[in-house]
Amino acid sequence: MQPVVMLVIAGVAMFSVIGGVSLLSHYYTLNGIKSRTVGDGQHGTARFATKKEIAETYVQVPYEPELWRRGENLPTAQGLVLGSMERVGKLYALVDTGDVHCLMIGAAGVGKTAHFLYPNIEYACACGMSFLTTDTKGDLYRNYAGIAKKYYGYHTAVIDLRNPTRSDGDNMLHLVNKYMDEYLADHTNLSAKAKAEKYAKITAKTIISSGGTDSSSYGQNAFFYDAAEGVLTAAILLIAEFCPDGKRHIISVFKLIQDLLAPSKVKGKNQFQLLLAKLPDTHKAKWFAGAALNTAEQSMQSVLSTALSRLNAFLDSELEQILCFDTAIDAELFCKKKTAVFLVMPEEDNTKYFIISLILQQLYREILVVADENGGKLNNRVVFYWDEVGTIPKIESAEMMFSASRSRRVSIVPMIQSFAQLNKNYGKEGAEIIIDNCQDTIFGGFAPNSESAEVLSKSLGNKTVMSGSISRGKNDPSQSLQMIQRPLMTADELKSLPKGNFIVSKTGTHPMRTKLKLFLKWGITFEEPYEIEEKSARKVAYADKQEIEEEIIRRYMCCMEEPEETPVEMARIGGMQQTPLTDTMKKMRQTLRTED
């Protein structure tokens, strides 16, 4: 019996040794070395945000569009929807309520519109933010203009450059005309007069700067652009003050300047000088044009030609249907009341893209004026959703918009497919300015060969992980462990993110992994597509130089003193020659004298 027990013990010992050797050999394999976070950040401290940190950074708002459209449980936190989470079977939106710009990056087909933009527009409507969207296909206004107006009480405006006869209007002189009318009704209202002059200067500067640079970039030619800006300001004020309704638009400004370039009957004076000479010496239009009026004749012709060259782009019979009638875009209304503006850009006709750039520049500058009058900040947040901004030509002064608008409670959300699009349109420095001014970046879903994934992988940073090596001798295998750095997410991992999964980076916080569901799963539904009534080609009325001149004489000639000498005598002593009065003007002057 004892030998049997000894054999059993020996067998158990033998199998134990074999098992131990097997376990030891398994331990000393490369598969046993796991890439887990170790150390104290010796090679990088990058990590994803915890649930607690996410809750502290973002406001969690129950996402209930069905109730919102009935006017129930409307959210009060204004901001951008950057993620979602489910809790107790209920969907919550993660909202960044800070004053931020947000850069959205994703390849074509990743779901930028269906997963990100639609939930954001619905939320913007629910919390009452005014917003503007750019769109190349027209889907945004067809799906949301009607909902915003019907359920949320928004004023909506659609500027459709693809179908100008099915578009709302955008008269660039609207605010100038508005405040000029207030001043003409009450000449003691100096505030209205000042605002008319301010918006005239903004419009002129926007047009002259439409080439993407300001006058300081033109070197020796800077005078001509500065003077052309003054001439445009003066012409805009003349149109607003002396033309009847229906003729006060930007095309009339072009026609007036062109008419004033015609030769006059007075030697050494052109029509522009003679027209402004009929204004009182204290009239601001005369002052704005002073640089051009007090220069040599050839230089003045160059100034007027510079102004005309900037206005040439507006000469389009289709665009006139948008530019020459009532406006649907009002910066003051946009800032103070719930307003949605949809800009439709035709991909097949890039000659009209400059209008989008001008609308954005002018609206931005006018928003700054409203903000400054309100203590430097808007009461109601405003958001610009620039969808497909990478596929259209450069939006002039975009870098300036990103740099200065955030503190005014104006958020911009550019949506691009790759960094290469920004570099192409805005150059390396311009792209860096835009990227650096975006406090939030949301990205996911990249093409297999995307270089943007490499850039974003690097921007996420590195973490410290365990690595090691195995060496095996004849009898004694050994293992060596080290700490190395590893990207928080490699480019390959970013490229393989499932659709609807995104990474959100925010200034001052750790990045967040989140999901943005398809708009249908957010509870968003669309109704009948929004349509604008077809407007037949309307006849455009233009300003007339003779009409403006007669109106100036009617208002101001009674205040002018009679010249003491004849034009010929004044010419001999070097004085300014006077314009011969037409029969109509003589009758008008006689009437005015009789009335006196």
Segments (PLM) and residue ranges:
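Basic- and hydrophobic-enriched, low-structure N-terminal and domain-boundary segments
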Residues: 1-110, 114-122, 127, 165, ...
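A glycine-rich phosphate-binding loop feature that marks nucleotide/adenosyl-phosphate handling sites
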Residues: 42, 324-329, 473-480
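General helical secondary-structure elements
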Residues: 43, 47, 482, 582-585
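General helical structural elements
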Residues: 51, 55, 467, 476, ...
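P-loop NTPase motor domains
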Residues: 81-89, 93-410, 425-428, 492-513, ...
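Conserved ATP-driven motor cores of ASCE-family P-loop NTPases powering translocation/secretion/packaging/pilus
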Residues: 402-503
